[in-house]
Amino acid sequence: MTILLCFFLVSLLTIVSSIFLKQNKTSKFNLPPSPSSLPIIGNLHHLAGLPHRCFHKLSIKYGPLVFLRLGSVPVVVISSSEAAEAVLKTNDLECCSRPKTVGSGKLSYGFKDITFAPYGEYWREVRKLAVIELFSSKKVQSFRYIREEEVDFVVKKVSESALKQSPVDLSKTFFSLTASIICRVALGQNFNESGFVIDQDRIEELVTESAEALGTFTFSDFFPGGLGRFVDWLFQRHKKINKVFKELDAFYQHVIDDHLKPEGRKNQDIVTLILDMIDKQEDSDSFKLNMDNLKAIVMDVFLAGIDTSAVTMIWAMTELIRNPRVMKKAQESIRTTLGLKKERITEEDLGKVEYLNHILKETFRLHPALPFVVPRETMSHIKIQGYDIPPKTQIQLNVWTIGRDPKRWNDPEEFNPERFANSSVDFRGQHFDLLPFGSGRRICPGMPMAIASVELALMNLLYYFDWSMPDGTKGEDIDMEEAGNISIVKKIPLQLVPVQRY
């Protein structure tokens, strides 16, 4: 029976594949260069490893635009700033939708969030809500005290390790910091108060598992339709995604139930803001929110806010310990600017140290937390650098490769913040050499919140402490192996020894 089933699947996939290959060969489009493909799977065999590095190798051989067919899904990989500008600026509207995958659909409650919602009226309304109500400058400032309190707590814990001369697991420290900030900002939940439904370690594990679920491709993603769903069912490909979703949903529901109790909305967190909007809705309103919309928006803030900021800080401190000259200059710049023996560093001090801003930019260039801009999908036929990009083509922008382009950057593999000293290049979406938050209509709305958290934490740790490798090892020997799928983090946790300076 099993042999017959396998024979049936292979035969069916071969027929389907031959149809797609025939269509591709007879295509009237001038498609970008493409590596050789195989029956059924297309170019999937080229993805043996971390995707950003696999696509990087293809771009070296085939150029800044590469056409792939992943199963039956057409994909164009963008690997230059010029091509990125053509997508994100020139053709922003035509490339403004999102491809639908099983993982993103499940965790976003059917694409009811901001990040994965397809382009249309719903996305415009929910995006407006995010920009005006949730992440406006005024709202980000209102959460300033939370960021300052949580960074103060980190400084206190690191000071305790400094007294013992014991190493600090900075990977865990940064994930704990961002989780604490986001849980208070988004959910009104404080790890340090009793009654928290999930302990902090489980929160961090859940974020990692959720990122894996979002980055786990199923047969349905590559072979849309009944056949893909059948193979997924046969091999239980949705099991892990459903398990993570079930735990996240229970967590969100617990938080919402707490907010619905009397005195449950004493904090002006994001859940409170959206529940208040739901309460004020009228029957005649054309745009209405429900609990699934709320959970989907919280999912965006919760997962993206915790993961990406922590990953950025880990890579920044990793590069600083590997480059003592840069570390020393950063500490001297911060200490000279802020003065000696400063009791507390707050967000009033942000923006005062230009060299720290250069370090952030250089970290975003070499180690973007997300090596790809969240994938886009073309809604109509467009042309990029003379090549045809048909409708319903997935666009993958490899910002990791763009940040290492030797045509745009001198010594691209070197961590050198000084390259930004006389440069106007910034990370806010107007310069296509540096795109950690994307650009155009779908730029990340949480960018101001993320930058404030990262800069405040790094400024504190570099001001109050000197840092060294444990057990007499040297920074140049540190392991730089990457891990992950959607976000790329240092595989081996970063452990450093702090020495109290002030």
From Swiss-Prot:
<keyword id="KW-0479">Metal-binding</keyword>
<dbReference type="GO" id="GO:0016020">
    <property type="term" value="C:membrane"/>
</dbReference>
<dbReference type="GO" id="GO:0016705">
    <property type="term" value="F:oxidoreductase activity, acting on paired donors, with incorporation or reduction of molecular oxygen"/>
</dbReference>
<feature type="binding site" description="axial binding residue">
    <location>
        <position position="444"/>
    </location>
    <ligand>
        <name>heme</name>
    </ligand>
</feature>
<dbReference type="Pfam" id="PF00067">
    <property type="entry name" value="p450"/>
</dbReference>
<keyword id="KW-0349">Heme</keyword>
<dbReference type="GO" id="GO:0005576">
    <property type="term" value="C:extracellular region"/>
</dbReference>
<dbReference type="GO" id="GO:0004497">
    <property type="term" value="F:monooxygenase activity"/>
</dbReference>
<keyword id="KW-0472">Membrane</keyword>
<keyword id="KW-0812">Transmembrane</keyword>
<dbReference type="InterPro" id="IPR002401">
    <property type="entry name" value="Cyt_P450_E_grp-I"/>
</dbReference>
<keyword id="KW-0408">Iron</keyword>
<dbReference type="InterPro" id="IPR036396">
    <property type="entry name" value="Cyt_P450_sf"/>
</dbReference>
<keyword id="KW-0503">Monooxygenase</keyword>
<feature type="transmembrane region" description="Helical">
    <location>
        <begin position="1"/>
        <end position="21"/>
    </location>
</feature>
<comment type="similarity">
    <text>Belongs to the cytochrome P450 family.</text>
</comment>
<dbReference type="GO" id="GO:0010286">
    <property type="term" value="P:heat acclimation"/>
</dbReference>
<dbReference type="GO" id="GO:0005506">
    <property type="term" value="F:iron ion binding"/>
</dbReference>
<dbReference type="InterPro" id="IPR001128">
    <property type="entry name" value="Cyt_P450"/>
</dbReference>
<dbReference type="GO" id="GO:0020037">
    <property type="term" value="F:heme binding"/>
</dbReference>
<keyword id="KW-0560">Oxidoreductase</keyword>
<keyword id="KW-1133">Transmembrane helix</keyword>
<protein>
    <recommendedName>
        <fullName>Cytochrome P450 71B2</fullName>
        <ecNumber>1.14.-.-</ecNumber>
    </recommendedName>
</protein>
<dbReference type="InterPro" id="IPR017972">
    <property type="entry name" value="Cyt_P450_CS"/>
</dbReference>
